[in-house]
């Protein structure tokens, strides 16, 4: 009776759980075949997607070979994925453990190779940074930049006529109040001088005898810079003027020799008004100022004197006035 009652109970769950599987043996009535290690039959259509999913996920998750029972079943099938090519990418030498690393390395080297100009031997950052520094130092070296600046700002290049710059050296100090105006005809020299007189006080100007330029000295460096900003301006709708810093040392030296005794004679005060004339040479403004103590002293030879008026009202100091002040508060 016990054996008779167990047969229908064992046959009913097998018929409901796996209808397509073959009839199980008597020893494995309550357990499915995949738990006991049985190889599934290739005829069942439900096992094909499960095998394909296991084969595609196994290289990415574990990185090892798939289970032995699965490999012989999908090699004979036409719908199985190319497992061999996936394993070749993982086991290739010099790359990472996952197939994503060779893609990153290749893109990294492709992106950085045009910048450096040299193909690095390994995808390390040190080699790429080193190869990047080499062309930068050769192209944009500080020595090259300094050399180009020096050539652009040299006095020979600033000279519009390229004749006076050869006599200058690097130790020469030029006067920044001098400018050279050029590009005008001889008939318009006075007109151009009048136009440049609007930018500052002109101390001296030297005209060229046969050329189309003149040297102008302003009172301050700020006025000279204002005149330099008019380089390339058109005057009279037909004359374009160029303005450059003056580098003609002969004009500056001649002006200094002439103006040196004149300046000393102008700023030398008379000896009669000041007791120490040596201090007034260095400070000409202090020589013309009066000492502060002189305002509080009235000299005997002054033109104006304060005379005390005898008829000025004064306070009465008599006894009666004092008594009235005490009593009435006056």
From Swiss-Prot:
Its main location: nucleus. InterPro entries: Nucleoporin_NUP53, Nucleotide-bd_a/b_plait_sf, RBD_domain_sf, RRM_NUP35_dom. SUPFAM superfamilies: RNA-binding domain, RBD. It comes from the Eukaryota. It holds the Pfam family RRM_Nup35. Keywords: mRNA transport, Nuclear pore complex, Nucleus, Protein transport, Translocation, Transport. GO terms for biological process: mRNA transport; protein transport. It is found in: Nucleus, Nuclear pore complex. Residues 173-253 form the RRM Nup35-type domain. The keyword Nucleus applies. GO terms for molecular function: nucleic acid binding; structural constituent of nuclear pore. Gene3D superfamilies: 3.30.70.330. The keyword Flavoprotein does not apply. Residues 1-32, 61-82, 122-142 are annotated as: Disordered. PROSITE patterns: RRM_NUP35 (PS51472). GO terms for cellular component: nuclear membrane; nuclear pore. Functions as a component of the nuclear pore complex (NPC). NPC components, collectively referred to as nucleoporins (NUPs), can play the role of both NPC structural components and of docking or interaction partners for transiently associated nuclear transport factors. Belongs to the Nup35 family. This is Nucleoporin NUP35.
């Amino acid at each position: 009776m016990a054996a008779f009652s167990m047969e229908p109970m064992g046959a009913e769950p097998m018929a409901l759980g796996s209808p397509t599987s073959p009839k199980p043996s008597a020893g494995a009535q309550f357990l499915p075949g995949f738990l006991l290690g049985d190889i599934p039959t290739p005829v069942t259509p439900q096992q094909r997607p499960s095998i394909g999913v296991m084969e595609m996920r196994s290289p990415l998750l574990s990185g090892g070979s798939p289970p032995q029972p699965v490999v012989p079943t999908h090699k004979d099938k036409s719908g199985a994925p190319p497992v061999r090519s996936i394993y070749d990418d993982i086991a290739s030498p010099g790359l990472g453990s996952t197939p994503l690393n060779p893609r990153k390395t290749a893109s990294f080297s492709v992106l950085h190779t045009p910048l450096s100009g040299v193909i690095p031997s390994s995808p390390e950052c040190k080699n790429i940074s080193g190869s990047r520094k080499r062309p930068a130092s050769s192209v944009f070296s500080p020595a090259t930049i300094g050399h180009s600046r020096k050539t652009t700002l040299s006095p020979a290049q600033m000279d519009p006529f390229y004749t006076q710059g050869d006599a200058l050296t690097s130790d020469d100090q030029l006067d920044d109040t001098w400018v050279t105006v050029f590009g005008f005809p001889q008939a318009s020299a006075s007109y151009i001088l009048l136009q440049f007189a609007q930018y500052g006080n002109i101390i001296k100007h030297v005209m060229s005898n046969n050329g189309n330029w003149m040297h102008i000295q302003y009172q301050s460096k700020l006025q000279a810079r204002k005149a330099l900003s008019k380089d390339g301006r058109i005057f009279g709708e037909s004359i374009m003027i160029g303005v450059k810093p003056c580098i003609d040392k002969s004009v500056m030296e001649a002006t200094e020799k002439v103006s040196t005794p004149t300046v000393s004679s102008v700023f030398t005060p008379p000896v009669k008004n000041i007791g120490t004339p040596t201090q007034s040479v260095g400070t000409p403004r202090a020589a013309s100022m009066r000492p502060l103590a002189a305002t509080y002293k009235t000299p005997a030879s002054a033109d104006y004197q304060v005379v005390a008026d005898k008829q000025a009202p004064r306070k009465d100091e008599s006894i009666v006035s004092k008594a009235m002040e005490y009593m009435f508060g006056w």
